[in-house]
């Protein structure tokens, strides 16, 4: 409905490598219909999780915009950043992910970028309240 906003959680898990940032835009079909993102449409370097977008209908015709489950409605661009890689260390790391999914991504992060996703990094996330990480990290080789 017109001017109504909703939070939309992606089905896919997004992993932004620590040397990139992610930028999201609505697919042109929906942009022309009046769909817009209210929150910052970006994902920080090193972010892993499901994206939550706050979308709003700004249609000039004031008609509802229907997005069906599974319909692709956004573009996601990876942009290489300049300078030293600095991974996201915020409370939304691993948002809307199961322990099994998190464990899988931790293995990838440690294997591919172990020098960046090191013990200091994991401890900083634990301090944010992501206590479940201790249990997962000690299970890993």
Residue ranges and their predicted role:
Residues 1-141:
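Non-catalytic terminal segments and appended small domains
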